[in-house]
């Protein structure tokens, strides 16, 4: 049985990740990359509290696009701002703290 390093409870009973999701201020915006392609950037997620690789994998499958996680931010190919907000809100992030630019 794994023990949470933050609260000391077993991983099954740990609520640290849920609390971290509600508190974080997430920014979602698009930028133009090479050849005029759009990339959706998701930043402001603390890597220590939330598994950013697993979150990237979930967002890529829900948005049906390619992407990666680099330097503490998630990059998705295409314009997926609204879909990302819906998915993050469904995963427990507070929709008030998700800022779309």
Curated annotation (Swiss-Prot):
Gene3D superfamilies reported for this sequence: SUI1-like domain (3.30.780.10)
- InterPro entries associated with the record: DENR/SUI1_TIF, SUI1, SUI1_arc, SUI1_arc_bac, SUI1_dom_sf
Q: Which UniProt keywords apply?
A: Protein biosynthesis, Translation regulation
Which Pfam families did the record assign? SUI1 (PF01253)
User: Would you kindly state one Gene Ontology biological process term found in this protein's UniProt entry?
Assistant: regulation of translation
Tell me the superkingdom of the source.
Archaea
List the CDD domains hit by this protein, alphabetically: YciH_like
Family, as annotated? Belongs to the SUI1 family.
What this protein is called in its record is Protein translation factor SUI1 homolog
């Amino acid at each position: 049985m794994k023990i949470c390093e933050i609260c000391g409870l077993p991983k099954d009973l740990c609520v640290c990740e849920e609390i971290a999701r509600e508190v974080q201020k997430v920014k979602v915006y698009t930028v133009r990359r090479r050849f005029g392609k759009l990339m959706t950037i998701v930043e402001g997620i603390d890597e220590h509290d939330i598994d950013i690789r697993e979150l990237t994998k979930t967002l890529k499958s829900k948005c049906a696009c390619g992407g990666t996680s680099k330097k503490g931010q998630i990059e998705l190919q295409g314009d997926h701002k609204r879909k990302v907000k819906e998915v993050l809100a469904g995963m427990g992030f507070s929709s008030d703290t998700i800022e779309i630019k």
